[in-house]
Amino acid sequence: METLALFDFDGTLIRGDSIVPYLCRAHAQGDASLGDLMAAATGYFLFRLHLRTAEEAKTRALQFRRRLSPARRDALDGGFAREYLLPRLYPAGKECLLAHAQAGRRVALVSASPDNYMRYVAAALGVDLICTRILPDGRADVNCSGQEKVRRLRAYVAQHAWTVDWQASYAYGDSRSDMPMLRLCGH
């Protein structure tokens, strides 16, 4: 029987949200224009007013990536993860994550953040990743937040044909959107 250790990312393992610094970095490197930043801000504003979905806001924020070559996207995404996100991990959070891995638990980042840069974070930490996928056409798939985190976790467990001891499993989060995942686990 497997036990899991599940970690939200933004606000739990790092301070704040990761997509805004990602967009700022893309702009600073010349990959995203000021117009792209304005489109992202507009998308976020419309989302907050409940006039757009989270998926639409993420798609709009990341639309500049469609103009980049695959190599340029990989360089931007990997560089952001290595040079910005990983150095900003809360030391106690990283220590906790690594301790769970050393204890033999299956460890996963479960995040609404997009996979284009989160995959580099997960790979560097040696953990699995369940997050919002960016489709080949640049659109964001279903936002991995709230009850969607639980749905994705159950699919992840079924895909691996694991039997999970949910009462002995751990979940870490910092917001209301993490509550369904937190309620799933005993710790």
Give the residues covered by each predicted segment.
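C-terminal cap/substrate-recognition subdomain and adjoining C-terminal extension
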Residues: 1-2, 75, 82-187
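Electropositive phosphate-/nucleotide-binding environments in soluble metabolic enzymes
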Residues: 13-16, 51, 67, 147-150
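Acidic/polar active-site rim loop that often engages polyanionic ligands
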Residues: 19, 57-58, 135-137
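Active-site phosphate/ATP/adenylate-binding loop shared across adenylate-forming ligases
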Residues: 48, 64, 68, 134
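Metal-dependent phosphoesterase signature
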Residues: 56-92
